Amino acid sequence: VSGVYDPDPGSYIEFDGHDITNEPPHKIGALGLSRTFQLLRLYQDMSVINNVMSGYHTRVKYKFFDAVIGRKKIWDQEKEIKDEMMELLSFVGLADYAELNASELSGGQRRLLVLARAIAMKPKLLMLDEPAAGLSPVNVDNLMKIIMQLKDKYGLTLIIIEHILKVVMDTCNTVTVLDHGQKIAEGTPSQVKDDNAVIEAYLGKKMNDEEMRKALAV
């Protein structure tokens, strides 16, 4: 979807009625599709607030004459954007670090910053690639809380790719399970948990409630 890999010959990728197969990232973002990668890609030497503001660039509506004669209009718009981005940083718990460089954040904080930048694009669909990878149990719980609030606060549809079962089971309404690239189950978390194909592929056996609780723990 992001253009890193080409689709199979003869196929294409459609989002919200638009063919985005060969579109550049800024056009895909402007259509309302945002994503995070497992490998973090931040501007390490830029401040936290500027990293988040970089995600808003597709929404900025400067015109040529504004830059020439409308400086106050630009300044007012930039202040509005910065205020909105500070509210977003507060939402993910990073407001106190706004003026620090991204390189000064911990690994868990950087993941939250990447998430905030993706939200700043105001997407219709937000795709998260293993958002909990490498996080401590406390940070995983915090991330899950934020994900649950995202759906209500920003009206987002989310697609989450994640290997930590607890995150999947506690945050997703619908779960799709793949085994070696093939879909083997789809349904609610409770339906998928009891699916024989899923049990065989991922758990190896039928589990009682206590064993399942331990398996779902981080």
PLM regions and their residue ranges:
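Catalytic Walker B motif of ABC-type/P-loop ATPase nucleotide-binding domains
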Residues: 126-130
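Conserved ABC ATPase "signature" region
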Residues: 64-97, 145-148
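A short, surface-exposed alpha-helical micro-motif characterized by mixed small hydrophobic
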Residues: 168-170
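Conserved ABC transporter NBD signature motif
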Residues: 10-18, 31
